[in-house]
Amino acid sequence: MKLLLFTALVLVVISLVEVEAENERACIPLEKECTKTPGNCCSGLKCDCYRRFEQGVAKGIQCWCIEKDVTYKGV
């Protein structure tokens, strides 16, 4: 009985460690593209999107993980 409980506990711990490691790998770091997965920026970051133009023609939307409290302005 003790062996069964110990084995179950070990399996639960291993599962939790694997899930946590998977979640850490899933986040997108600072200044990396998040167009397809806007909710996956790492902690403290937000996905900010911009419409891209080339010679006045819209070429799509691109999104990047940036710091939450930072505002960027064009020069």
Swiss-Prot record:
Keywords: Disulfide bond, Secreted, Signal, Toxin
The UniProt record lists the keyword Lipid biosynthesis: no
Tissue: Expressed by the venom gland.
Entry PTM: Contains 4 disulfide bonds.
Residues cleaved off as propeptide: 22-25
Keyword flag Oxidoreductase: no
Signal peptide: 1-21
Pfam families linked: Toxin_35
GO cellular component terms listed in the entry, alphabetical order: extracellular region
GO MF, one annotated term: toxin activity
Subcellular location: Secreted
Family the UniProt entry places it in: Belongs to the neurotoxin 19 (CSTX) family. 06 (U6-Lctx) subfamily.
The protein's name: U6-lycotoxin-Ls1d
Organism: Lycosa singoriensis (Wolf spider)
